[in-house]
Amino acid sequence: QYCPLQADCIACQNDLTADLPVPKPRKTLPVRETVHLILLDQERILLKKRPASGIWGGLWCFPEMSVDQDSIDYCEKNLHVRVTKLARLPHLQHTFTHFKLIIQPHLLQSIMHQPVCEEKCEENSYLWLTIEQAMQQAIPVPVRKLLSMAYPYFQYHIHE
């Protein structure tokens, strides 16, 4: 291809046009880790509406806790639901502009058939939904991926 600056171009004279300009090295993004709690109760899962501001503002997500907390204790103390662990699903990484998020999904089964959270959680901030209903909600892509990952477990446990 012809370039009007070719005669004065050092890169062209030294056959370096494919190598120049050298891109700046990418900035290393900080990494944050979190645990998403995928709670199953019969044919439903629990979703929580996120605050309007911040990441995924106003979208529906799984209840979330820090990686150093125990999921069974967290569910009892914060969600008022007694659970048993089913599985830890593979980690999911999602990259935002300013950081990488590593999600550790914990799949949990409600021990009670009528979770107390329906009565004691903040009004309109939690919903028990079927996976089909959840997929119709405003949910971020990582939550959609986690729902797909959990689906085989979900099918198995409602037909036990």
Residue ranges and their predicted role:
Residues 1-160:
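Intrinsically disordered, low-complexity, charged terminal extensions of DNA damage-control enzymes
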